[in-house]
């Protein structure tokens, strides 16, 4: 039987390689917030992750990503909005995570929070895309979300987020993710048990 006495395990993915990446700064701020609530957090660094299909999935960076996804009980995806959508940097990370690895499903039943940053006015195109991807990855995406407009104005020089309604929303999102993860993590097997898969297994075994 799985032991759920450990803190909720939250993996952060972000979608920019810039030195002062606002999607990374937003993810790091969210990580600090949810850590104070009691979660354990890990971040995947997308630098040196090859393009999907460029190398075998035995590549060390791919294996690191897959192991982190399997370790996680919840995830946070943070992306800039680029041409009305998420960046290729984030999409490449998601594309490397398969729906199945043998009998293991690296994302099924995980909770998911989505966040985006914009250089201009507030937009929701990136978070909407991430919600669609979360559904395809069989994840439980929480209702709340964060969209930070003019992100270059919202962070101190040290990378921490300024006190503002945008930061308040990030706190709300992390609080909701923490609660949903606690509520769902020991019920994933029950919630993801499907008639069609049971039927297919009977036909295969029979």
Swiss-Prot record:
GO terms for cellular component: cytosol. Homotetramer. Keywords: Flavoprotein, FMN, NADP, Nucleotide-binding, Oxidoreductase. Belongs to the ArsH family. Its cofactor is FMN. Gene3D superfamilies: 3.40.50.360. It catalyses: a quinone + NADH + H(+) = a quinol + NAD(+); a quinone + NADPH + H(+) = a quinol + NADP(+). This is NADPH-dependent quinone reductase ArsH. GO terms for molecular function: ferric-chelate reductase (NADPH) activity; FMN binding; NAD(P)H dehydrogenase (quinone) activity; NADH:ubiquinone reductase (non-electrogenic) activity; NADPH dehydrogenase (quinone) activity.
